[in-house]
Amino acid sequence: DDAAKLIRGKKGSQVVLSVHRFREADLIEFELTREDIKVKDISYSGMLDNQTGYIRLTRFSRNSDKEMKKALQELLENNMTGLVLDLRDNPGGLLNAAVNILDLFIDKGEMLVWTEGKTQKSKRQYESKTVPLVPNDLNITVLVNQGSASASEIVAGTLQDLDRAVVVGRSTFGKGLVQTVFNLDKNRALKITTAKYYIPSGRLIQKPGYLPDDILADTTKQDSLFYTKGGREVSGAGGITPDHEVELGSGSPILSASWRQGLFFNYVQKHKIDYNSFDEVEADTTIMSQFEEYIYSSDLDIFMKGESNYLDMKDM
């Protein structure tokens, strides 16, 4: 927080940052001009092949639907017949952004999501209000994982419930609570959970166990199985269960330890001066042998499963 306060300032003014870079003995100074920085919600969009488009959406903000519409239009102009929508590790964001994005895919008048809580005021319904930009015969695959939450789950789950897309990956986070912010004074606010999100099949996005059911009266759905618009069976255990589950690969102890201790990043920083551009890098046997030697020379603390606990007990 202290660093952020020092960096912030009037737009157009200068600030000098001193940076300690890996393998550099002295600090490096950068003089920066303060400006409003706009971070795009779509980190990448393009054609994977002659038919399949790909869009990576990293969050849901005020501009998400505009960026999505522009990306879809460009892909459709390239004769896209199938789309991969990547929502992996997307933590969510604004509900309205999720609803507006669903408008681009779902027929006008369809129920998209609704909220239920203890009071009548907390009950709201959201329907598609426009003719979809994306043709109904265009195949859609949505990628999700355990890092997909909130608005990501609304988009993935609604597309799944309305049989508009196939969901692939890992079960999502399960964050489906509506929170209302009450300002206490100029510097403080109180955030209270007031309702839960439900998607078209009637499924609750929130995973059980996070919030006692008696806090939000009459909102608990006991059924664990629900059905899509076309009659497909889907799980209602919280979060979004993919139509096709992808198993996580299990890494070796040395691979896991190398990743945790930053050896991949450190190796790249050490050798990046050997190349003029990324295109020059070739993952051949030479570079793999060099990396292997680098790992073994790094004196890693590597333990088999349960070994560290055993050693701790032995030293007691």
Residue ranges with predicted function:
Residues 204-316:
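Conserved functional hotspot residues or short segments at active or partner-binding sites
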Residues 36, 58-59, 118, 146, ...:
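A broadly conserved detector of short glycine/acidic/proline-rich loop/turn motifs that flank catalytic sites
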Residues 151, 157, 163-164, 168-170, ...:
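Polar, glycine-rich mid-to-C-terminal structural blocks
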Residues 1-185:
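Cleft-lining beta-strand/loop regions that shape enzyme active-site pockets
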